[in-house]
Amino acid sequence: MAKKMKLSDITNMFAGMDVEALEGVTIEGDIEIDLGGLGGGFDPMLAAALGQESAVLAQHFARLAGMFGYPVGIGAPAAPAVSPALAAPKLKDLIPAKFDVANIAEWATEIQEVPIGNTSADGGSRGKRVMLGGEKALPFYFDAPMPNRNQVTIDVFDMRIGLAKAVKENYDEVMDSPGEWAKKNVEKFNADMITIHLISTDPLIKDTPAKEAAKTVEEVLQAVDVPIAIGGSGNPQKDPEVLARAAEVSEGERCLLASASLNLDYAAIAEAALKYDHDVLSWTQLDMNAQKELNRKLMKQCNVPRDRIIMDPTTAALGYGLDYAYTNMERIRLAALMGDDELTFPMSSGTTNAWGARESWMVSSPLKEDSDWGPREYRGPIWEIVTGLSLAIAGNDLFMMMHPTSVAVLKQITQTLFGMIDTEQVDVANWIGAEV
């Protein structure tokens, strides 16, 4: 294979020799011009590059000819012509765009409407029926109105329990009578619903028989005419029996049985709901995939109709817990709107769980170097309000709450956003100088 050399190599080879002229010397070879980097097609850019390379080649030959005694005059290669840059067009108008929440293409699925409570027209004795769901977008957008407002159910227990002082002072005189407790919640604190928790049935507390616990449900049904939710003690072995007996004595009232979960006999609870005309609360623990699984089993295995399922994805208190709860609920609602038919159900929040955070009820921080927490009489209700309002924005429909002030504030805010309450218009353009 012939050795390749550059013209500059030949020039450099004779540069160190005292040679004035060469006679009778012939240099033979092929000349290659490297145009690497240029694409195919002979265009003006290629022509300019080729001309420039040819000029450089001519310079090398001129220098070599001079060394051999044949000086050749040659000028420097001219710079390639540069086309003038085109001026960018001036922007006159922005690209037209419209944000229409009511017609977002990805949100093509409506949330299932689920009624709670049967009036006399429905075969029950409730004075009203609560309707949840029906949304076609995330909540509180004025251009995508919610068909049904948020509802609040206030907790009642079948025995006296330990409560935060700020809560207990509102119920102390009625805590020994579930019927009176429920009545006070409705008449004084404007509860939309009542949730009766049969916690005394827990074998580790009083182990109240299911038959006796059912009498408490009857007492509450006679005391108030709003729809009710019926909760067990949380014991996975006892709850199916307790809820089945409670469903029997409240037949035809369309109560919400709370709750079916993957760690107990959900099929027994679903069977009782179908047999005695009730709804089922599908409860999971901050896991969207588990929520899908339980909903699927209730529908496919237990044949629960879609209009009898309400989800409770779990509510954790302020802090990281609320972050998880909010994110989980928002993901569930967005997935439902985008067509996941295993998640297109209304959601319920155990907002009362806010009182499980020590910051909501402790007098002060246990850390000496910590800042002042402020009076717990205000701090606790605010804790519950913020928990509920955060989850309302995520798409929650039903709130289980305790403190009457928290109930009043949450209802006022959500009903204002819903459009039920008219408020004074505020000039937001003057936000710097506005008085608060």
From Swiss-Prot:
One of its GO terms (biological process) is methanogenesis, from acetate. Keywords: Methanogenesis. The keyword DNA-binding does not apply. Signal peptide: none annotated. Pathway: One-carbon metabolism; methanogenesis from acetate. Heterodimer of delta and gamma chains. The ACDS complex is made up of alpha, epsilon, beta, gamma and delta chains with a probable stoichiometry of (alpha(2)epsilon(2))(4)-beta(8)-(gamma(1)delta(1))(8) (Potential). Part of a complex that catalyzes the reversible cleavage of acetyl-CoA, allowing growth on acetate as sole source of carbon and energy. Probably maintains the overall quaternary structure of the ACDS complex. Belongs to the CdhD family. This is Acetyl-CoA decarbonylase/synthase complex subunit delta 1. It comes from Methanosarcina acetivorans (strain ATCC 35395 / DSM 2834 / JCM 12185 / C2A). The gene is cdhD1.
